[in-house]
Regions:
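Polybasic/polar functional segments that serve as interface/processing modules
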Residues: 1-29, 42-75, 89-92, 97-113
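Short amphipathic alpha-helical segments
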Residues: 31-33
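Short hydrophobic/aromatic beta-strand micro-patches
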Residues: 36-39
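Active-site beta-strand termini and strand-to-loop segments that position acidic
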Residues: 77-79
Length: 113
């Protein structure tokens, strides 16, 4: 299974919402996809780390690096060619990464599943 599908299924398993995927292949030499998702709580935020890590390992991919592991509002999961940002709703609104990425078209996640 493709790595992006594994990650999207893991995010879905912990009921994250407002998931946006940006195709960065033409924009960044460092990663192919940039994901943003929202959580309702810090517990859900932390659950996303373990679900993504476990599911990637089970699918034969490397263990991701995690920044903000002890944060209760924003974590970044570095899966090498895919970057996943999980925010609480308020933190996502505060940082507003979508505004910074406004020129980049987002991908319909149903096409990736």
């Amino acid at each position: 299974m493709e790595k992006i599908k594994v990650i999207l299924e893991a995010l879905d398993a912990v009921n994250l919402f407002d998931i946006v995927v940006y195709d960065m292949k033409e924009k960044s030499p460092f990663f192919d996809y940039f994901l943003i998702a929202s959580s309702t709580s810090d517990r859900q935020l932390q659950a996303s780390i373990s679900h993504i890590s476990k599911d990637l390992l089970e699918a034969g991919f490397e263990h991701p690096r995690v920044e903000g592991k002890n944060s209760n509002s924003w974590i970044l999961i570095d899966c090498k060619d895919i970057i996943v940002n999980v925010f609480t709703k308020d933190e996502r609104e505060f940082y507003n990464l979508e505004k910074m990425l406004a020129e980049i078209e987002s991908i319909d996640i149903e096409q990736l599943k």
